[in-house]
Design a protein with these regions (language model features):
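Stable alpha-helical elements in mature extracytoplasmic
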Residues: 110, 134, 150-160, 360, ...
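Glycine- and hydrophobic-rich flexible loops that cap the catalytic core of alpha/beta enzyme folds
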Residues: 369-401, 405-568
């Protein structure tokens, strides 16, 4: 998103005026935020004008009774009301006080209207977002799917937001509006209930599953053969890394999942078992149980036209704002629950830490919503983490139950190559007309732009949003059996979130659920995004439910793009909710979910449906499992502090595997040997001050680059990495004279190999095969070719030494992982990718962090792109079901979205150290911790 708002100017005065406008914005922001005299008007008071009133009384038309807003020393509000409508109206008012700029940017993103705020620089992004149509689907949900009660709450929330906005200029709402006002005349508009619903679509997009893997597998075929692609998508290691659900089975008679049952033999009548091996195309298997032969490319080289289309789609995806974070292997969340049998309190403990992109302010907003007396008139007494712009609590607890979430990772998207003929597309031997609509994109400081969005029976044509793709599609050569050429090809997206659903109903039902039955009933409505839901209650029960709208496929397993003209590849429906896996009070006494496989679906007798071909590979989940078992063996008990320490576990699973091998390498160079010795006696923990962790992670990065990265096509490699390679598709003998120079095309956050736990499994499988072809790397001007594992390891040890010498200095004793692995928090829009002074004023950091890729303390980095932190535990919580007031929580930043407010980043230092804050819940404890009290009166 732009930080230089001068891009919104549509005048013809050229670069000089753009530079002048940019200087105005920079000077203005500095003047406002720093309190530099810019006339009487632009004084420090302009900054403080947008700070919320947190004491005294405010009259709020529309309330039926008084509402108390009690804030603790961190500015976290607890709201007390006598009716549901008053409660959610107050929630809207308070969140707008602290976070309206964030809310406004989000709703412009979800509706494809960023250009209205930031000008022509965002037109391409808006075109893609309009094509996806998040806001259109959200409106359909609101109009036709949501319950009357949910609509009432959404309306009350919107009323509260608008009550805050009433009579205020932009500069009174947030300092960013004051800066924006010098480049265009944008003014915030009223909030609508649909604005809140649309945020769930944005969530679903960033948590959509395996679409990038689907693209990558096809793009790999230009450089890799079927067996090589299979190597890079190994089977899930069920025996070593346990799935979430280990008890129960699908009942072939009742067609339901039975948490206490056993498989009843061959399953039939499951409505089609998507993911049947080897259907369509040719070639072997790929993905975690998926097939490389289940779509257009099969196991052979993807046709040139398909590769061009998918490369363009990948580029278009990079342009869409990453709301929650990068979408790839190793990214996800941790949540686990331990029954009272294994805890000091005798009641369950539940932990959760979702891994998302670092944002300022945090994507989460801590809040309590309390009815003074719970009744039919006022049903809620809930506390936890909310999203600014959306009523209710997303993760947290009420007076009876607690719940957490991690990304299920279900495959809910498919790409279809569509065959065009005239003004239509081919399907089942016929030409069908496109469904089309016209969209008008308004541009701040410029002319509006009209676009046409076309859809097939599979979904919107996302390839239309790339001019180059339109040209390529007309000339595409497609080898796969297809109808006559006609007028080219395009790529359509089918995605479960583009069908209206009831996920907003689920939020409110979760907030008032009182037992596991009510929890599961609410979970059944949580259709998108598909999340692992973990559960505990005051009565001592623990549980888990896999919800979501997950497709059942005919041919294909979703691991590769499918031919849109073939009806056999259409979805056949969705997995019934009562057939989705769950657990309730498992015998082992705990449940761990950290994006690993939900269930062993390789055994069709136990479970006939395919949830995905692309699970996370379970490095984090198994480490958590091991920590729980080690703590509870011989009757040991787990405390809240133990749960916190588990969340901060920095252990590197891949280091445990590789370091013994690396220490056996005979290193000749004394400076490289000096670095190698850092690994001797290392305990494999990636603390911020660890020199060994810094060196190992650099070695790991170089192993991946030499063994895998340099063999990938340019479409997957990081931008700026240029190699001399054989021409793509070359089948003749190697010829140095014919090599061409190819440079990577991927953004650093999404390039491959990213170093996630999929690559742990790739390297694990070939580690003992010392002459495997993956260990072979060509010679360079300074290095000899490597012909085996130890030669490649020696080269990686050397390359890492010089890499860190350049970055951290010659003296290895001064090295530390945290100096490489740094977190900078960037304010939305004005704090990202913009002029340095503006970033300096609005951003915070850096912090030197421990943890790493696929560690439990998952401070993620992309090995192809660098060492910097690209996703984090966006919050951490531990819920104590014995005494909610002894629960703990922390947010990445603070409650406020206002730069220089005391609560802008007041939790970040504690978060970085792994500390947690007290989490008050009962009236007495909240009152004791109250620093500010605001009364909202009708």
């Amino acid at each position: 998103m732009p930080s230089n708002t001068t891009a919104s100017s549509g005048h013809k005065s050229g670069k000089k005026k753009g530079r002048r406008a940019r200087l105005v914005v920079i000077v203005l922001v500095l003047a406002i935020v720093g309190g530099i005299g810019f006339g009487a008007y632009w004084s420090i008071s302009t900054v403080r004008a947008s700070f919320p009133q947190t004491k005294g009384t405010i009259k709020l038309d529309g309330l039926s009774g008084p509402v108390d807003v009690k804030r603790d020393g961190n500015g976290i509000p607890q709201i007390y009301a006598e009716s549901d409508a008053d409660l959610f109206m107050a929630q809207g008012y308070v969140q707008a006080q602290d976070r309206f700029w964030e809310m406004d940017v989000r709703r412009h993103m979800t509706s494809g209207r960023l250009s209205e705020m930031f000008g022509k620089s965002q037109v391409k992004t808006d075109e893609f977002l309009r094509t996806l149509g998040w806001h259109r689907v959200a409106k359909k949900e609101y109009d036709s799917k949501l319950s009357p009660e949910t609509k009432k709450y959404l309306q009350a929330y919107a009323k509260g937001v608008n009550a805050y906005l009433a009579g205020k200029d932009g500069k009174d709402i947030s300092v960013e509006y004051a800066a924006l006002g010098f480049t265009n005349d944008y003014e915030p508009q009223k909030w609508t209930p649909v604005d809140s619903v649309a945020w769930l679509k944005a969530m679903a997009w960033d948590l959509r599953g395996n679409m990038e893997d689907e693209i990558d597998r096809s793009l790999m075929t230009s450089r890799l053969g079927p067996s090589q692609i299979k190597d890079l998508y190994p089977e899930y290691p069920y025996k070593r890394n346990k799935p979430v659900v280990r008890e129960g089975a699908y009942d072939g008679v009742t067609k339901e999942y039975d948490a206490k049952g056993a498989a009843t033999g061959t399953q039939t009548g499951a409505g089609g078992t998507g993911g049947t091996a080897g259907t369509g195309g040719t070639g072997g298997t790929g993905g975690t149980g998926g097939t490389a032969g289940s779509g257009l490319a099969g196991g052979a080289q993807a046709p040139n036209g398909l590769q061009s289309q998918l490369s363009g789609v990948s580029d278009a995806l990079d342009e869409v704002p990453a709301i929650l974070g990068p979408n790839g292997n190793g990214i996800g969340s941790n949540s686990w629950v331990v029954s009272g049998e294994h805890t000091i309190t005798g009641k369950p403990l539940l932990a959760n830490d979702p891994h998302l992109a670092p944002q300022l302010p945090s994507v989460w907003y801590q809040m309590g919503l309390h009815c003074r007396s719970v009744s039919d008139k006022c049903q809620y007494d809930v506390s936890g983490y909310t999203f600014s712009g959306m009523p209710g609590v997303v993760i947290g607890h009420n007076q009876k139950i607690a719940w957490g979430m991690t990304n299920l990772g279900a495959d809910v998207t498919d790409l279809y190559l569509e065959k065009f003929t005239g003004d239509g597309y081919q399907f089942d031997g016929k030409v069908l007309p496109f469904t089309s609509r016209e969209e008008t994109i308004k541009v701040a400081g410029g002319k509006s732009k009209k676009i046409t969005v076309r859809e097939t029976n599979n979904g919107p044509l996302i390839s239309d949003r790339n001019d180059e793709l339109v040209k390529v599609g007309k000339k595409a050569h497609v080898d796969t059996a297809a109808p006559d050429r006609g007028d080219g090809y395009g790529v359509a997206l089918r995605w479960t979130a583009l069908n209206p659903g009831k996920s907003m109903d689920a939020v409110f039902d979760l907030n008032k659920a009182g037992n596991f039955k009510e929890f599961r009933k609410a979970a059944a409505l949580f259709e998108v995004p598909s999340q692992n839901l973990i559960y505990a209650d005051k009565d001592g029960h623990i549980g888990y439910q896999a919800p979501g709208r997950i497709p059942v496929r005919g041919k294909g397993d979703g691991s590769l793009p499918a031919p849109g003209w073939d009806p056999e590849y259409r979805w056949k429906g969705y997995i019934p909710q009562n057939a989705l896996p769950y657990e309730y009070d498992p015998k082992r006494g705990y449940i761990v979910t950290a994006n690993q496989a939900v269930i062993d679906d390789s055994d069709k007798a136990k479970y006939p449906y395919k949830l995905t071909s692309d699970w996370g590979y379970g490095a984090r989940s198994q480490r958590i499992d091991d920590l729980i078992r080690s703590k509870t063996e011989n009757g040991g008990k787990i405390s809240t502090e133990d749960m916190r320490l588990m969340q901060m576990d920095n252990s590197s699973e891949i280091a445990k595997l590789l370091v013994p091998k690396l220490l056996k390498i005979d290193v000749k160079d004394k400076y490289v040997r000096e670095a190698q010795k850092l690994l001797e006696g290392w305990d494999y923990t990636q603390d911020a001050d660890s020199a060994a962790a810094a060196y190992f992670n650099s070695v790991w990065r170089n192993i991946l680059k030499l063994a895998i990265g340099n063999k990938l096509p340019k479409e997957l490699r990081v931008k700026g990495q240029c190699l001399n390679v054989e021409p793509a598709g070359n089948t003749g003998p190697a010829d140095e004279g014919k090599k061409v120079r190819e440079c990577g095309q991927r953004d650093a956050d999404s390039a491959q190999p990213d170093g996630g736990d999929r690559y742990y499994e790739v390297i694990r499988k070939i580690l003992d095969d010392e002459t495997n072809d993956w260990w072979k790397a060509p010679a360079t001007r300074t290095d000899k070719e490597t012909k085996n594992r130890d030669q490649l390891f020696a080269r990686a040890l050397e390359d890492a030494r010089w890499d860190l010498t350049a970055k951290l200095g010659k003296d290895v004793d001064t090295w530390s992982w945290g100096r490489l692995h740094r977190l900078t928090l960037k304010n939305q829009t004005l704090g990202t990718e913009g002029p340095g002074w503006v970033q300096y004023v609005l951003n915070r950091g850096p912090w030197n962090l421990g943890g790493g890729e696929a560690a439990v303390n998952a401070t993620g980095w992309n090995a192809a792109g660098g060492y910097g932190v690209v996703w984090v535990p966006s919050m951490r919580m531990v819920v104590n079901l014995k005494d909610f007031d002894k629960s703990k929580w922390i947010n990445l930043t603070g409650a406020s979205g206002h730069a220089y407010n005391a609560h802008y980043t007041d939790q970040t230092e504690k978060w970085a150290k792994g500390e947690l804050l007290p989490w008050a819940y009962t009236d007495k404890t909240v009152e004791k911790g109250t620093s500010d009290k605001l009364v909202l009166r009708p």
